[in-house]
Amino acid sequence: MNNILVINGPNLNLLGKREPDIYGNITLENINQKIKLHFKNEDLKIHFFQSNEEGKIIDKIIESEKKYNAIVINPAAYSHYSIAILDAMRSINIPVVEVHLSNIYKREEYRKKSVTAEASLGVISGFGYYGYIMAIEFILNNLVREK
């Protein structure tokens, strides 16, 4: 069985309440349920982790190499400046795909740069919760099922 870790960064626990004009009314729990439902027939276990604390995210990334086949990460605001998360992502030997709910290139200038993208296989941005599904499909089709 394949194990994929989905990491969500700061303030994503506020989805459904925070800036619904940008993120919609869907909650993080709803997103997690939709992801699980989409992959219910796969030989796949999806694990979810959310933290508002940079250090906890770093610890989770570092320990993930021994437990998971890949990571899907939405570093949220940390994507724009966290060299520490970037370094943690570079230190592991499993694939990482970065996801953003909103199109970061249509947002404020400071949101248009993702430093963590440098350690990601790719970045999916602007497709809402479906970006997570796209990332997992990519992982399964290109990295896991091929083996």
Curated annotation (Swiss-Prot):
Gene3D superfamilies: Dehydroquinase, class II. Pathway: Metabolic intermediate biosynthesis; chorismate biosynthesis; chorismate from D-erythrose 4-phosphate and phosphoenolpyruvate: step 3/7. The record marks R18 as: Transition state stabilizer. One of its GO terms (biological process) is amino acid biosynthetic process. One of its GO terms (molecular function) is 3-dehydroquinate dehydratase activity. It catalyses: 3-dehydroquinate = 3-dehydroshikimate + H2O. InterPro entries: DHquinase_II (IPR001874), DHquinase_II_CS (IPR018509), DHquinase_II_sf (IPR036441). The active site is at Y23, H100. Substrate binds at N74, H80, D87, L101, S102, R111. Its EC number is 4.2.1.10. Keywords: Amino-acid biosynthesis, Aromatic amino acid biosynthesis, Lyase. Signal peptide: none annotated. It holds the Pfam family DHquinase_II. Homododecamer. Catalyzes a trans-dehydration via an enolate intermediate. Belongs to the type-II 3-dehydroquinase family. This is 3-dehydroquinate dehydratase. It comes from Clostridium botulinum (strain Okra / Type B1). The gene is aroQ.
